[in-house]
C-alpha cells in the first residue's frame, strides 16, 4: 500500500463526469450477451482442478441453477419468460444455461475453463427456465404449497449430492434481465467445479441504464420479498450455511433486507436465530447502495451472518455516476467525509473487532485491472480466485493470502499482494488440508 491518501475516497468530480457517462453507457450498452468470465488465476496452472474433485460431475456444456424471482412471469411453465413488472409473489424454478455452441463438447469447455488464453469469447445462452412453484411472500411461512415443497426438496437433493454443503445465493445488479442473472450464476457455479449449489435471485430490474430510477424503486419494493426468501431457505433447506453474493445494486435489496430480517426477529434469542437462519458469507461486490445507509443496515444485522465482506474500488466509474444520481457516495466507493466522528469510530471498530472484512480493490495493487472496473469480482482472475476460495472454504482474508493494511485512524483494509497467485495457491493447499 502507499499512503493514507489512497483511501480518502471521493465522489467523482464534475470535470470527469463526461468521461464517466461515456464509460457507463459503454458498460450498459455493450455485450448484451454474457460471455464466459476469464479463468480464475488458481485454475490456470493445472495445480488446482475443482472439476477433478467433483464426484458427481456431469461432463456437459449445460449448467442448471435454481432461481427465485419476483418478476412477473409469462408463457408456459416449462419455458417461462420473466418481464420487468414487479410481483409480490415469489416464483421458484430451475434454469438451464448452455456454455458455448451446441457443438461444444465437455472436453472443449474444460480446456477453456482451465486455460489463461482463449482464441474467442464463449457465449452463455439461457435454453429454458422452468417454473416449478409460486408462493405469496406475505403468507405465513408455514403455508407452503406442495409444489413449493417439491422445489425445496430438490434443493436439498442437490445439496446431498454436492461436495459443498452451503447454498450460494447470487443477487444481480441494475440494468439486468433474467437471462444475464442466470448466466452470471451459472458461470459462478461452473467455476466452483460445479461443486456448489447456486440459486440466483432475479429482482425486476428495468434492463436499461436510462431507467435506473425504476431499478432503484423496484429494488426497494423487493426488500420484504427477499427477506422472506431468506427465512424460507433457513426453514426448508438443509444447507449448512446460506451464503449471499450481492453485486452492485443488488446491495439495495440485500443490505436493507438483512436489516429488516433482524428487526423482525429483534426479540428472539440471537443464538437460536443464527442457528435458524444459518447465514454464512455475505459478500458485497461493488455495492451500489448509499454508504451511510449501508452502515446503518450493517450495524443492525452484523450479529446474524458469519462474516460480511465489503469490496471497495475508489475509482469505480459506474459507482461514481450512481453517486451523482443519488447525491451521496456508494458503499463500494465511499466518501468517509460523509460520516460523523461516531460513525467513523464504528467503522474502525467493525473492521477490527467485528465480522467485517473490507477489501481494497484497485489497479494500483492488482495488475492488469482497469482502474474504473465495476465487474472485478468476476472479470479479474485474481479477484475471482479470492471469491471462490472464500465461498468454498469459508476462509478469512489472511487465510486466503491477502495482506492487512491499517490506516492511520485505525481502519483495517485487506489488499492483494504482488505475489498473490503464489500466495493463493499455497492458501488453497493449506485450506484443503485443514478442511479434510
Task: List each language-model region with its residue ranges.
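N-terminal secretory signal peptides that target proteins for export/translocation
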Residues: 1-12
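Alpha/beta-hydrolase fold active-site loops
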Residues: 166
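The conserved beta1-alpha1 loop
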Residues: 169-173
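Gly/Ala-rich beta-loop-alpha elbow adjacent to hydrolase catalytic centers
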Residues: 226, 246, 250, 254
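Sec-dependent N-terminal signal peptides
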Residues: 18-24
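Lipolytic serine-hydrolase domain surface
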Residues: 35-142, 153, 161-162, 182-186, ...
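C-terminal motif of bacterial Sec signal peptides marking the signal peptidase cleavage site
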Residues: 26-29
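Short substrate-entry loop that stabilizes the transition state in hydrolases
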Residues: 176-181
